[in-house]
Amino acid sequence: KEENYFFKLSKYKDRIIEHIKKNPDFIQPEFRANEVLNQLEHIEDISVSRSKESVSWGIPVLGDDSQIIYVWIDALSNYITALGYDPETPSEMFKNYWPADVQVIGKDILKFHAIYWPAFLMALDIPLPKTILAHGWITIDQTKMSKSIGNVIAPKDVMETFELSHPDAFRYFMMVTAPTGRD
C-alpha cells in the first residue's frame, strides 16, 4: 500500500449509467455496453497517482514531487490535448473535432474509455465522444495476436506483400474486414 491521490469515480457512476441508457449508440457493440453497465455496479474510486518510488518516470503531480500521474490519465487526456484543449480559450481544432464521432478501441481497454474517460470529461464539463466502438482481438488459430507470443504480422510486411502505397489503405482494410463484436 502507498499514499496516492484519488478521483471520486463513484460521484459520476449514475451519470455514466444514465448516459449509456439514454444513448444506445454510445458503446458499440451493444453487448459491450452491457459489460460496462455491469462493471459500473461495482465501481470504486480510482488512484490517479503513483508513488515516485514505485514508478520512476512519468508526469510529476503538480506541487507533490513524491507522486507521478497515473499513466491512463496522461494517455486519455491526449485525445483532447492533441486538439489544443484549453478551458479558457479552446483551439479551433478542439472546437471543430470534439466531441469525437467515434473512438475505436480494443475490448481490453474498454473500462478506461467507457468508464474512466467519461467520468474525467464529466468532471471537466466536456462533452463525451458520441460513440465508443470496442473491437475484438485479431487472432491466429484462436490465439490473440501478441508481440510477446511472437505470432504477430507486421503491417509493414502486409503493405509490401500487397503493394499498398499508404498506411491508410491497410487501416481501411482492417476496419472493414475485422469483426467488431468478436475475436
What is each residue range found by the language model?
Residues 1-183:
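Structured secondary-structure scaffolds
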